[in-house]
Amino acid sequence: MIIRSKSENDVYKWNMSYLMMMKFPNMRVRFKFKNRRPGEKFDQKFIEDMKLEITKLRMLKLGDQEKAFMKKNFWWIPGWYFDWYQHADIFNPDSIRIWLDENSEFQCEVEDLGYIVTFWETNILPIFAELRNRAYGYTYDKMNESEALELVREQINLSNEHQLKFSEFGLRRRFSAVWQDKVDDIIKAEAKYCVGNSNVYEAYRLGQKISGTQAHEIYMAYNAIYGYREGNYKCVKDWMEVFNGHAGILLGDTIGQDAFLKCLTTL
């Protein structure tokens, strides 16, 4: 399985899910995949491989120890939310459509309640990336591991030398699940200034802090609901209210830095 646990998702997904559950419990949302390589063609085998991995998502479990880890580390979200998440039917295959269009380009849409559908994105993306790599013959067993690890160590050494703090945000763009494990193992062992991991599964596996707060998608949703004039302000206001000022890293580049800073002065 490419996705190994119900905890293998990015931190900000639980934050945004909880916000939407509190503010828009009945709102339905549609996500649409956009390949940033327009014109790239796939075959039916790729579609079947995607569907197989998507089917496996519904089989994922969240163990009691993982849930306890999440309750402790997501201290700004009430514990009952993770009790709900442990048993919720998040990855219902009836919510997703995958197909090839008339140009053999990959298409994917997911529709469900907003606080559920958000989890799909950062599982679909690593599945797509790994299967695409396999389709092109780029697999872990064929890579030059020593050369690749040397590149990782160069970045770690740079961080250590200059005391540069960083977080690991590799899930959505990773080469493969096995490779993320390898990289995170080295970061854990050698990096002095890694402050956290956005992949909760990896953070739990390695005993790291979780890292991350929100994504552009939440501002996009608010702008769709309230319009551009009010959406940014409402998003920041609700975020601060729901989390009582915690989870306080806010994105300022969705509609422009000047507009974002202006909205902060009116809270």
Predicted regions and their residues:
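Ordered alpha/beta subdomains of enzyme catalytic regions
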Residues: 1-231, 240-241
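Catalytic core of soluble alpha/beta enzymes
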Residues: 236, 242-267
